Amino acid sequence: MHTAPSCNPELLQSSSPGVHIVMEGREVFKYAVKAMEEAVLALLEQEQVSIDAISLVIPHQANVRILNKLVERLGIGAEKVVINVHKYGNTSAASIPIALDEANRASRIQAGDIILLCSFGGGFTWGAALIRW
């Protein structure tokens, strides 16, 4: 594709293969969950921190289904996870800072807490970080 359909109205009507961007949602979902889970587990092993030592998890707020599946696979209680995607939608790179600020303002974070941040985003990039508050 050489141009976005919105720039060329004829492309909006086209059913030709290769003209429109297509996302394989199920595959992206599976890959996102797997990539974040692996990043989190590798980080915890590297830093010698157990999952039980985590006080709060603040994941990228892309999709509540991805968040729920990640939490399930990691065995983290829902009470330890900040989810606000239902309030703001996917705010892209701002989702973790917004959720961190909300958790702090709600006194969900105390001095000395270990906070897990994890993300998966456009371009198939992902990562995880630990913060001691």
Regions inferred by a protein language model and the residue ranges of each:
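Hydrophobic pocket-lining "lid/loop/helix" segments that shape and contact the acyl-thioester
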Residues: 1-85
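Buried hydrophobic packing segments
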Residues: 40, 96-103
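Short active-site-adjacent structural elements
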Residues: 65-68, 93, 124-126
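Hydrophobic alpha-helical segments
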Residues: 73, 77, 88, 102-106
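Active-site-adjacent helical/loop segments in soluble small-molecule enzymes
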Residues: 84-96
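Conserved beta-strand-centric core segments of catalytic alpha/beta enzyme folds
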Residues: 100-133
